[in-house]
Structure formats: C-alpha cells, structure tokens
Regions:
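Substrate-binding cleft of extracellular glycoside hydrolase catalytic domains
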Residues: 1-100
Length: 100
C-alpha cells in the first residue's frame, strides 16, 4: 500500500502543516499534474495490484492537506482527490484500489 502525502519535507527539517506551496487548491488546479501523471503511468505499467491511500486524515490540522491548514476547504479536498483519481483513470491504472 502506498500512502500518498502531498507535502515537502527537506531531509533533516521538521514537517510542518503550513506549506502553502502544496495547498489542495494547487493540486486541484493542476500544479502537480506532471508528477501525478508520471506516477499514474508507472503504476499502470506495473500491472500488479496497488493500494493507494491518498491524503488520509484530511480532517486534521496536522497535515498540509488538512482542512485547517493552508486555507484548505473540504471542497478543495474533493477537487484535488478527484483530479488525482481522473489522472490515474486516464493513464489506464485500473490496477489501483483506492483506500479510504
């Protein structure tokens, strides 16, 4: 299972929730599509079963994708999740099961 956590944490630095460069609206608007598309193609090429847990615990304040960080809203979460899911579907990554 892959736990996909959209944040930036340089080695040796603490992980903090306030990271506006990875706000959900940016994901939903396509700022990271190149990265997501690359992952989707690689997962589709793998062909074995893959479980992806995308942006878990979204209702907490402790993650950059949480609804209390970076100006995120529940609507932003839904838009970002759907965008990532659509990209995987377009890539033919039908070997993915999405974990809630």
């Amino acid at each position: 299972m892959i736990t996909w956590e959209p944040w930036r944490a340089p080695p040796g630095e603490p992980r903090i929730a306030e990271q506006p460069d990875v706000a959900l609206a940016r994901i939903a608007d396509g700022a990271f599509d190149d990265l997501v598309e690359r992952w989707a193609r690689d997962v589709a090429a793998y062909r074995g079963p893959v479980l992806i847990r995308l942006m878990h615990e979204m209702n907490g304040f402790w993650y950059p994708w949480g609804d209390a960080a970076n100006g995120n809203s529940p609507e932003d979460f839904v838009r970002a999740w759907r965008r990532v899911h659509r990209i995987f579907a377009r890539a033919g990554a039908d070997n993915v099961s999405w974990v809630w």
